[in-house]
Amino acid sequence: MAQGEQGALAQFGEWLWSNPIEPDQNDELVDAQEEEGQILYLDQQAGLRYSYSQSTTLRPTPQGQSSSVPTFRNAQRFQVEYSSPTTFTRSQTSRLSLSHTRPPLQSAQCLLNSTLGAHNQPWVATLTHSPSQNQQPKPSPPNRLTGRNSGRVR
């Protein structure tokens, strides 16, 4: 790879790593949380650093529509860096979704369990958590899908 391509790739990586999903200015904030932490693998002289953020906003009803069904916008961002004497890995996942039901808040731990080695190694963690001040409603019962293909195994 040419030096110019490497520089452009590094610049894009830094931009991607530093720019979170921004909420729409017209949306009303419903829930927000952030988590950061560090895991040390003492026996491997390695470490993992992570950050997770989630925000849920309520979208306003478009002008001229009289819909009483709310629309929630959920933005999630998970970043992780793993560093050892022989390896450096950086990963980021962003997810943006719209739904008519309020999504539950998640924790970074469920995402860390999918990170190589994070779920089965002894670790020391530092965790900061800032939960939403808004009360979470009771979860609604799960919806059941019915139709031509429901219940059919392929």
Swiss-Prot record:
Protein name, entry field: Movement protein
Pfam families the UniProt entry points to: Luteo_Vpg
Free-text function comment from the UniProt entry: Transports viral genome to neighboring plant cells directly through plasmosdesmata, without any budding. The movement protein allows efficient cell to cell propagation, by bypassing the host cell wall barrier.
GO biological process, one term: transport of virus in host, cell to cell
Family: Belongs to the luteoviruses movement protein family.
Native source organism of the sequence: Barley yellow dwarf virus (isolate MAV)
Transmembrane region(s): none
Keywords assigned: Transport, Viral movement protein
Domain of life: Viruses
Positions of region (Disordered): 83-103, 123-154
